[in-house]
Amino acid sequence: MTLALALYEPDIAQNAGTLARAVACLGLELHIVEPAGFPVGDAGFRRAGMDYLDRAVIRRHASFKAFEEWRRAEGRRLVLATTRGAVAHVDFAFTETDVVLLGRESAGVPEAVHESADARIVIPLNEGARSLNVALAGAMILGEALRQTGGFARTGTG
């Protein structure tokens, strides 16, 4: 079991494809909680993921309920990245079995998902800034989680 990234009902294919490429390069899993705002596998998704999509481990869940059933059965902690988080991502103690959940680009996640999270983290931003692009935020959080857990590959570049 390894660190994983989950996208809650993603709106933008290119962001999801970019994150699929990131997890493929980092040896992680991507979970897509549907419905997505695009057909998974659409041209924008494939273009952003490039040929790395063949290497990506992507698991699709028909609903948040189905995702939660999987997560609880696996005994994994859900770490929600949110602008309402109380702990900065760099101050949070990640484990190698965490699932980091990113919300929809347009609306984040509903309150019920907030309540399901075991932890809520935030990327601190300058005053007046609302949020980062979800793909950038995901990459920053995964980088910190992998740094903390020693999860970066130790040999070569690919």
Swiss-Prot record:
Reactions performed catalytically: cytidine(34) in tRNA + S-adenosyl-L-methionine = 2'-O-methylcytidine(34) in tRNA + S-adenosyl-L-homocysteine + H(+); 5-carboxymethylaminomethyluridine(34) in tRNA(Leu) + S-adenosyl-L-methionine = 5-carboxymethylaminomethyl-2'-O-methyluridine(34) in tRNA(Leu) + S-adenosyl-L-homocysteine + H(+)
Gene Ontology biological process terms from the UniProt entry: wobble position ribose methylation
UniProt key word Phosphoprotein: no
Top-rank taxon: Bacteria
Known function: Methylates the ribose at the nucleotide 34 wobble position in the two leucyl isoacceptors tRNA(Leu)(CmAA) and tRNA(Leu)(cmnm5UmAA). Catalyzes the methyl transfer from S-adenosyl-L-methionine to the 2'-OH of the wobble nucleotide.
Oligomeric form and interacting partners: Homodimer.
Family: Belongs to the class IV-like SAM-binding methyltransferase superfamily. RNA methyltransferase TrmH family. TrmL subfamily.
Protein's recorded name: tRNA (cytidine(34)-2'-O)-methyltransferase
Biological source species: Ancylobacter novellus (strain ATCC 8093 / DSM 506 / JCM 20403 / CCM 1077 / IAM 12100 / NBRC 12443 / NCIMB 10456) (Starkeya novella)
